[in-house]
Amino acid sequence: MGNCIRTEMWKAFHNKMMRSALLIGFILVIADLVQTAITVSDLGASYAHSPGGYDGCSLFVNWIGVNGVTVGAVVFYAVWPFLAAMPYGWSLYEDNRSHMTNNILTRVPYSQYLTAKMAAVFVSGGIAIALPVTTDLFASAMVCPACIPRVALPITGFCSGTAFLAKLYYTHPWLHAIIWCVIEFFWGGVAASLCIIVGHKVKHRFFVTATPLLLFLLLDFITPMLADAMNWYIELSPLRLCNLASTNPSPTWIILAELILLTFVSVLAGIYRKYRHEVL
């Protein structure tokens, strides 16, 4: 099992699609940083002499995980499921297409192969999302003052009392931001793992890679209607829950619940594939 996991991890992190995903992510981070630096520079003097002080220039309302307005942030959070799947989400399909699976299964059981594959897909997807976001956090700290935003300002509306770890945001914002970077890792991993569901069925590599984005776009269309029908004023779309600056409140429990649910779906798909292989 250990050798199988190491092999899959090596393949996941040593391919051009991983490099391409990170390149796109870092280009969007640079775009976010440039726009943020210009905005903070233009507003710095006026905020310094206003009753609101430096709240609008604070790191904790301007880094990519929370600002929701820069071109880099908007594009990143519009395509993040695709970026997560780019590094290795397509690998199960590619192994089947090239008949590499048959070669591998002469040396290891299918259960070990599939477990290693899912682990590599999860980790590579998580890194593809979390690494650019974390880099943006620390790079933004070089241009934005790390002052603690005050409660009930329009610029902190995304972090109301019901939002993700809201109390921590207003007391220990650095810890809140770092925890969110970890959550981003899990979002990326969960999204990439959804490719396992269609890896044996879809006959085109692009559509396998696009599966998480297409699924999340569908859920983004359906979940607002569900929320309205249930009179829930919370964000249900996983596409938007990956961004702290979502339109509706995103409580901690709904974020964790959706991560667990999507992980369960991916694991269930893996168990089904193992069962089908044993039957056949």
Regions found by a protein language model. Give the residues of each.
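Aromatic- and glycine-rich beta-strand/loop motifs that create alpha-glucan
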Residues: 1-25
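Juxtamembrane helix-break-helix junctions at the cytosolic face
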Residues: 21, 192-205
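Helix-loop-helix units of permease transmembrane domains in multi-pass membrane transporters
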Residues: 90-124
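Membrane-helix interface segments
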Residues: 17-18, 109-111, 115, 204-209
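Central hydrophobic cores of alpha-helical transmembrane segments
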Residues: 21-28, 205-219
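Junction motif at the cytosolic side of a transmembrane helix
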Residues: 197, 201, 258-280
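Secretory targeting signals
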Residues: 28-90, 119-196, 237-259
